[in-house]
Design a protein with these regions (language model features):
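An N-terminal assembly and electron-transfer interface module characteristic of large anaerobic redox
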Residues: 1-231, 236
Length: 236
């Protein structure tokens, strides 16, 4: 028998807090501002660590993609924390709409919520393919444009941070610059500014110019690529 899952309705936009997994730290911090500007009350989750992954493994088959374990574990850990009004909380997860199993994460999450004792929690889908047509969360063209702008800003901040951080004279200077620009961009985004291509073309050089002011010592560095997320580790 098919489970009749709770739907995220348009009315919930005003009454519910939407929890969002932190899948790309810098980009998602900016995406939160875009969603808030569009009228959604949302929060990017910051809980992480091996306990989160183990909680996801408890409610999801171990053959499932590891990102699904992390995302579902992060959601369940947040709901278990007691910080949220469970009658006015919703979850948001992405759907690719392609052949990847990521399109099915939303169904795995709904099953996990029932198993964990949260059958009343609605899950909204963030996708660009017209999936979940009965959902009250709609990716409109204006919202999509705002989200894309946030991703561009986030990608640039990450690229500049990675170019500066290994050589900075003062440890943490690049990360502090990222935080300052996220706060600055956030204020602009909440005011409805910074989304257009003209505004982005104006802002990108300003960001690069400020990163260039960070004192660095350019010395040869061994380059190692680490595929890593703090959500999956103790981060020690």
């Amino acid at each position: 028998m098919e489970y009749n899952y709770p739907k995220f309705t348009p009315e919930m936009k005003k009454t519910h807090t939407i929890l969002i997994p932190n899948m790309a730290i810098t980009q998602f911090r900016l995406l939160e501002y875009a969603l808030r500007y569009d009228g959604y009350k949302c929060e990017i989750l910051g809980n992480c660590g091996s306990a989160v992954a183990q909680l996801g493994l408890k409610y999801v088959h171990n053959d499932t993609c590891y990102p699904a374990l992390l995302v579902i574990g992060q959601f369940l850990d947040a709901l278990n924390s007691g910080k949220y009004d469970l009658e006015h909380t919703a979850l948001l997860i992405t759907q690719t709409g392609g052949g990847c199993r990521a399109s099915n994460y939303i169904h795995l999450l709904r099953k996990a919520l029932v198993k964990a004792g949260y059958p009343q929690i609605p899950v909204a889908s963030l996708n660009f393919s017209g999936l979940e047509k009965d959902s009250g969360f709609q990716m409109t063209l204006p919202l999509a444009r705002k989200c894309i702008a946030c991703i561009f800003y986030g990608d640039m901040l990450c690229a500049l941070r990675n170019q500066v951080a290994p050589y900075e004279n003062e440890k943490g200077a690049a990360d502090r610059m990222v935080d300052r620009w996220i706060a600055r961009l956030g204020r602009a985004l909440l005011a409805g500014k910074g989304f257009t291509s003209r505004e982005m073309k104006h802002t990108f050089p300003l960001i690069a110019k400020e990163f260039a002011t960070i004192p660095v010592t350019r010395v040869p560095k061994v380059k190692v690529c680490l595929l890593y997320t703090s959500d999956a580790a103790d981060d020690r």
